[in-house]
A protein has these predicted regions:
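N-terminal Rossmann-like NAD(P)+-binding domain of SDR-like oxidoreductases, especially those catalyzing
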Residues: 1-183, 308, 313-318, 322-339
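C-terminal substrate-binding subdomain of Rossmann-fold SDR/epimerase-dehydratase oxidoreductases
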Residues: 16, 22, 29, 35, ...
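Short aromatic-enriched loop/helix-cap "lid" or pocket-rim segments at secondary-structure transitions
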Residues: 41-44, 132-135, 188-191, 255-256, ...
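Residue-level recognition of oxygen-bearing side chains
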Residues: 65, 96, 103, 189-193, ...
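The catalytic Tyr-centered alpha-helix of NAD(P)H-dependent dehydrogenases
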Residues: 137, 149-156, 186, 190-194, ...
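Hydrophobic alpha-helix immediately C-terminal to the catalytic Tyr-X-X-X-Lys motif of short-chain
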Residues: 159, 163, 167, 197, ...
C-alpha cells in the first residue's frame, strides 16, 4: 500500500510516518509538507534513509501542485494531518487557518475523486465540540455531540469535517474522520503546553499558565493516537467519525506541576498570565465507539507518557533548542511576555 501523509513533518504526522514505516515495512509512505514554522525536516532524518519513504515539499491548498503529485504518485490512501493548529495564532490571524484547514482539505479530496476515488482520512480534533463545564465530570464528547466551536482554529477544523462528510454523501468518496484529544510525546513543537513547560523548566525560565490553570484536557500519547488512526484507515467503517481519547484528564496546572516534579524544579517557576479569549474549560472524549468497533484502547498512562516525553526532550536538546532560538522566540515574547 502507498500512503500519502500530509503534514508529515509536523508533530503527529511525523510520528505517524514512523509508525507506518516501523509496522508495515513493505508499504510506501510519501510525506507532503509545506514546512511552515511547525514543520521540521530534522524530524524526518531517520525516515529519509528508508527507501520506502519519500518527502515532497508543497502546499495542500495548491491545486495544480496537488493534482500533479497525485498523477505521478497514485497513492492508495491519503491521511491528512496538514493543518494550522495553534489556537492563539488563529486568534491573531484567522485567514491562514481558513486557507489550509478548509481549502486544503477540499483540494485533497478533489484529487482523491479525480484519481480513482482514493481512500481519504481526515485527522480532526475534539475542539470542534466546544467545551464542557468543569462542574460536570460525568459529561463527555461522543461522535454525536453537536459541533460548537470556540475559536477560528476549531471553526476551521469543524468546517473541514463537514466538508468531508459532504463529499461522502454527495460523491461517495470513501472517507473517515477521527477527532482526538490533546496529544503529547516526541517531536512536539514547543509552543504547546507540555513541550513549552519542559523546555522552559530545563532552562529555569518562567512557566506561563493561563488564568488559574483550572482548564482540563484529556491527554493522549501520540503513539497511541497513531495506532488508532492506523486501525481506522485499515478497518474503519467508511463515512464514520471516530473519537480518540486518552482517559487521562488533568488540569493544566496539574500537568505543569507533574513536569516540575519529574524535573526536580521549583513551583516558583509557575507564572499565571492573563487568560486568552474564549479559553475552553474542559475537553473530555468518550472513545467507546472505536473500542467497541475496532478494539482500540490507549496503551499509555499519563504518568508513564510524561516520563517518556521528558526523557525524549532531555536526549534531543539540539532539536528543540534550535527551534526556540529562532522565529518562535519572537512569537513567544509577543504571546506571553506582557500578559
Amino acid at each position: 500500500m502507498k500512503i500519502l501523509v500530509t503534514g508529515g513533518a509536523g508533530f503527529i504526522g511525523s510520528n505517524f510516518v514512523y509508525y507506518e514505516l516501523d509496522n508495515y515495512p513493505n508499504d510506501e509512505v510519501i510525506c507532503l509538507d509545506k514546512l511552515t514554522y511547525a514543520g521540521n525536516l530534522e524530524t524526518l532524518e531517520v525516515a529519509m534513509k528508508n527507501p520506502k519513504f519519500k518527502f515532497v515539499k508543497g502546499d495542500i491548498a495548491d491545486r495544480a501542485f496537488v493534482d500533479e503529485l497525485f498523477a505521478s504518485e497514485k497513492p492508495d490512501v491519503v491521511v491528512n494531518f496538514a493543518a494550522e493548529s495553534h489556537v492563539d495564532r488563529s486568534i491573531e490571524n484567522p485567514e491562514i487557518f481558513l486557507q489550509t484547514n478548509i481549502i486544503g482539505t477540499s483540494v485533497l479530496m478533489d484529487a482523491c475523486r479525480k484519481y480513482g476515488n482514493i481512500r481519504y482520512h481526515q485527522v480532526s480534533t475534539d475542539e470542534v465540540y466546544g467545551d464542557l463545564p468543569l462542574d460536570r465530570p460525568d459529561l463527555f464528547f461522543t461522535e454525536t455531540t453537536p459541533l460548537h466551536t470556540s475559536s477560528p482554529y476549531s471553526a476551521s477544523k469543524a468546517s473541514a469535517d463537514l466538508l468531508v462528510q459532504a463529499y461522502y454523501r454527495t460523491y461517495k468518496l470513501p472517507v473517515t474522520i477521527s477527532r482526538c484529544s490533546n496529544n503529547y510525546g516526541p517531536y512536539h513543537f514547543p509552543e504547546k503546553l507540555i513541550p513549552l513547560m519542559i523546555a522552559n523548566a530545563l532552562n529555569d525560565k518562567k512557566l506561563p499558565v493561563y488564568g488559574k490553570g483550572e482548564n482540563v484536557r484529556d491527554w493522549l500519547y501520540v503513539e497511541d493516537h497513531c495506532s488508532a488512526i492506523d486501525l481506522i484507515i485499515r478497518k474503519g467503517k467508511i463515512g464514520e467519525v471516530y473519537n480518540i481519547g486518552g482517559h487521562n484528564e488533568r488540569t493544566n496546572l496539574e500537568v505543569v506541576k507533574t513536569i516540575i516534579k519529574e524535573l526536580d524544579k521549583s513551583e516558583d517557576l509557575i507564572e499565571f498570565v492573563t487568560d486568552r479569549p474564549g479559553h475552553d474549560r474542559r475537553y473530555a472524549i468518550d472513545p467507546t465507539k472505536i473500542h467497541n468497533e475496532l478494539g482500540w484502547l490507549p496503551a499509555t498512562k499519563f504518568d508513564d507518557g510524561i516520563k517518556k516525553t521528558i526523557d525524549w526532550y532531555l536526549t534531543h536538546k539540539s532539536w528543540w533548542e534550535k527551534i526556540i532560538s529562532g522565529e518562535y522566540k519572537d512569537y513567544y515574547d509577543k504571546m506571553y511576555k506582557n500578559r
